């Protein structure tokens, strides 16, 4: 069968499959078909709930199978290692906290991989950025193998006083420093994270076989490079691989702790499941590796990405992953490669981060859909389910708060926490860590903050910037609070409206309402007491910050 015909059939097939999945979920939601229910529908179990429950079950199953595959791969390490290609570690730095940057560079120095090339590119060449070059000299600059260059320009914008000849000379100097040095640091004109990554990739060219990416707030496990490299060298159809990203400062605040349990679920359940089918949709910036031969193919297209006529300057890592998928190569995840990274400790900075990630998610969802036909049907199915789920959830919440009864609202809240407890219990089993039970707390954060942030992200999808602000910068942007405030007002208004319009409670409904309220209250009291007893007492105690041996560097 001709290749063009095969491709056309796959495009049609995956498109019909995506429509069937979306149509099935929509039909189940609209019809509200119920398998079982009590009299007057105080309790019920319907088709829509069954579909969501089945999705979570299947996702958890394939995540478990992928972890079992990883463990078996680890047991096979006694066999002779295959030929190892050359690797360059590229670190993107911007207004980084000095302590985090030192930890990052020291961890890079300790990586157990011979002849690893380390390239750090600093986004900024002003006097206030010079401390990062000083830290580079302090940690890695004490040998003849180290080199650096302070560049007035970058590859796409000339600095003040630069001529065409001096700009070209600067480009050549950057390439020479990067290729001739084992450890190199380039300070360049500010241009954003994508500009920084481009400089590292462009300067390396085809001088290495694989490129590992890393953020400057990341502490790397000594074995992280070899573990990701093993995945790439075992299967030539794998174009990129990501590792297990955990939180470096998880006990700094309640928001960083909840982020830590959410990270674990995102990587070890959601991405592990995607990895089983070879379609991980985002190789995270703190820990990822790509085949350089592929990266150099799409480097210019990746850098010059546009959306709705505007140049894209966020979602760099997700688009990098999408470019690999667009070529038909598989993307994988390995929990055997680990790192620790900083996460926001303040609610506002966390909200800004999540809004930006949501922007890149929805934008890249559209790009990713162009390549559904090149990969397993799971990628199509999961993209449809996760892409449309927030909208179904918002519609459900608004309907319940404005057209339901008080009991319906309480039952919904109880159901949300029940699903959260089930997922948290599974995570406790899979990870072997009782702390994962607090994953159920994250559901409240999702309902109250992430849902409105996603809608706001779509509305402002073309607004750009560097990313989450540098660790030395105090966040003063309160714009993210606007959608959250509106959402809370909508919910409170709906609750008041429902309470005002509702008839007197029947005896049965009153009994359900009192029982449900007591159960919901007891749940939160118990979980908060556990949090205060187990987690809160650790906050601020630096010796307990790190759960991995490689963190103390």
UniProtKB/Swiss-Prot annotation:
Membrane topology of the entry: Multi-pass membrane protein
Residues bearing carbohydrate: 462
Pfam families named in the record: Glyco_tranf_2_3
Positions on the Extracellular side per record topology: 37-44, 399-408, 462-473, 537-553
Pathway where this protein functions: Glycan biosynthesis; hyaluronan biosynthesis
CDD domains: GT2_HAS
Residue ranges, Cytoplasmic side: 1-15, 66-377, 430-440, 495-515
Assigned EC number: 2.4.1.212
Subcellular localization: Cell membrane; Golgi apparatus membrane; Golgi apparatus, trans-Golgi network membrane; Early endosome
Cofactor: Mg(2+)
Gene3D superfamilies membership: Spore Coat Polysaccharide Biosynthesis Protein SpsA, Chain A
GO CC annotations, alphabetized: early endosome; Golgi apparatus; Golgi membrane; hyaluranon cable; membrane; nucleus; plasma membrane
Chief location: membrane
GO molecular function: hyaluronan synthase activity; identical protein binding
Entry's transmembrane regions: 16-36, 45-65, 378-398, 409-429, 441-461, 474-494, 516-536
Changes after translation: O-GlcNAcylation increases the hyaluronan synthase activity, HAS3 stability and its plasma membrane residence. The concentration of UDP-GlcNAc controls the level of O-GlcNAc modification.
GO biological process: carbohydrate metabolic process; extracellular matrix assembly; hyaluronan biosynthetic process; polysaccharide biosynthetic process; positive regulation of DNA-templated transcription; positive regulation of hyaluranon cable assembly
The reaction(s) this protein catalyses: [hyaluronan](n) + UDP-N-acetyl-alpha-D-glucosamine = N-acetyl-beta-D-glucosaminyl-(1->4)-[hyaluronan](n) + UDP + H(+); N-acetyl-beta-D-glucosaminyl-(1->4)-[hyaluronan](n) + UDP-alpha-D-glucuronate = [hyaluronan](n+1) + UDP + H(+)
Keywords: Cell membrane, Endosome, Glycoprotein, Glycosyltransferase, Golgi apparatus, Membrane, Transferase, Transmembrane, Transmembrane helix
InterPro entries hit by this protein: Nucleotide-diphossugar_trans
Activity control note: The enzymatic activity depends on the availability of cytosolic levels of UDP-GlcUA and UDP-GlcNAc.
Known partners and oligomeric status: Homodimers. Forms heterodimers with HAS2 and HAS1.
Recorded family membership: Belongs to the NodC/HAS family.
Annotated function: Catalyzes the addition of GlcNAc or GlcUA monosaccharides to the nascent hyaluronan polymer. Therefore, it is essential to hyaluronan synthesis a major component of most extracellular matrices that has a structural role in tissues architectures and regulates cell adhesion, migration and differentiation. This is one of three isoenzymes responsible for cellular hyaluronan synthesis.
Name recorded for this polypeptide: Hyaluronan synthase 3
Gene: HAS3
